[in-house]
């Protein structure tokens, strides 16, 4: 047994909580999956309730809705023959025709995230499965809509904007070997590159370089295009300039972050964990030392961090899934388990966003926490052989 400092729901009062390290997380995961697959989709195309913001965005959202559920389930179990999954996909299509949502094309909150997940699902469906054509039709419809809606998207970032959409379109191109989509991607990547080069000339802070809403996510998408589709020296050089800039910004911010960081400054979406993940996705050992230093820094301030994937401690754990640092990884898992309990359905649930343990959304709830604990890698990693 270990004792770890934890904090109660909405109070800033610390207490000691005993952690039972005998949890079999694979069994806990099976219990979670069985529960999810027992659920029906409601009239709003939701499987379970989200938080206030999650109820406002599209129910197919990766961050808050169906896409996150499907992605998790398709990686944790063979669900290609599961009738409940097909029911969800059919119900969503019948109920969401014509609906318009905030950031409705984005990879975290909209249809490009759904495209990404359906492409994952499609790869696992056998050719004689009667649902295969349904999935293909859905994929092609989303692809066409994204192409026609792309220019209406006003931002370039990964979570909300054009770079995240382009990553999903690249995945579509890999799966369907589509010449027209390749031409579209080539043109739009050049536009993204020109924006990126202009932005890195004017960077003044680490916050501008975060993964979800800043330049690291854009750099990642350009990097994927350059390594998997069409190499350009100019693209490679711009990435090198950005990486050097990012290293310098991290070094300059280390002392301040080592004294008074905020939760978001350590997170995936807006902080250091997202930047460390970006460095890990380069698969370049030269960044090992800086990754290690900032992982230790983030762990030092575990008490100010929530537990979830997007904004909390699970984003640090995601970076540790790329590193051979077993002790630190186990320590983070111990802390997350110290924030867990058994719910009325017998599921091991974790304190999530806003101190709630009832959220299952991938981005802010239990699915993302389980994902990191079970050692999985970044959901949006892309290679042709994958």
Model-predicted segments: where are they?
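Well-ordered alpha-helical segments within folded domains of soluble proteins
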Residues: 59-74, 105-122, 157-171, 207-224, ...
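Low-complexity, Ser/Thr/Pro/Gly-enriched N-terminal "stalk/linker" regions
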Residues: 10-65, 71-86, 190
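Active-site cradle of extracellular carbohydrate-active enzymes
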Residues: 238-266, 272-273, 279
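Inter-helical turn/loop segments and adjacent helix faces that build the functional surface
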Residues: 121-128, 172-183, 225-236, 282-285
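Long, well-ordered core segments of solenoidal/helical folds
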Residues: 27-46, 78-101, 134-153, 184-204, ...
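Terminal, non-catalytic domain-edge segments
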Residues: 1-35, 224, 281, 286, ...
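Mature, well-folded catalytic/scaffold domains that follow N-terminal targeting or propeptide regions
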Residues: 26-30, 43-50, 106, 132, ...
